[in-house]
Amino acid sequence: MKPILISALTFIVFLTLGCREQSSSKIGTDELQAIFPKGELGPAENFTGRAWNFGLVSNDTTYTTLVGNVYFEPGARSNWHTHPAGQILVITDGVGYHQIEGQARQTIKKGDVVKCPPNVMHWHGASHESGLQQLYIIPNTEKGIVQWMHPVSEEEYNYTK
């Protein structure tokens, strides 16, 4: 009986350590849990680094809402931009950053929900070490969808205050 108990306890200890090690590892390019296909590579004039967009709900006159999934590779980010009716981000995996003009950069992670107010300049993207996957929701598209601005500089991307 004692050898069975020792074997069972040893198995539980190794299982626990293995799970702990896996959960504390960094989330890089290939380690995010994909919910949707990667989609199309975002245009270089709107993104620094590689960001992939997969549309989920197309714009129409009934729902007037766009929904899609964006995957940012580590270090990738959007340009500064605005949305006439605002934007909601639901972070589904990874770690990244979001910043509203004039405010401190915020760290965002899986499970976070970010509300970008209408006509307020902001950017979002992956952290240095981790990819970021997000759902975006753009409501009231009859007001317009997005106005792209200039790229986020390295200084802005790295500035934490």
Regions found by a protein language model. Give the residues of each.
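Short beta-strand His + acidic residue motifs that chelate non-heme Fe in jelly-roll/DSBH
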Residues: 80, 98-99, 122-127
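Short, conserved beta-strand element in jelly-roll/cupin
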Residues: 69-73, 82-98, 137-139
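Bacterial Sec-dependent N-terminal signal peptides
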Residues: 1-26
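N-terminal post-signal-peptidase region of extra-cytosolic proteins
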Residues: 52-55, 70-76
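A short hydrophobic beta-strand segment most commonly corresponding to one strand
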Residues: 129-147
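Short acidic-glycine-tyrosine-enriched beta hairpin
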Residues: 102-119
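Ligand-binding pocket scaffold of soluble enzyme catalytic domains
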Residues: 76, 98, 132
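A short, N-terminal "cap"/entry segment at the start of jelly-roll beta-barrel domains
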Residues: 19-64, 145-161
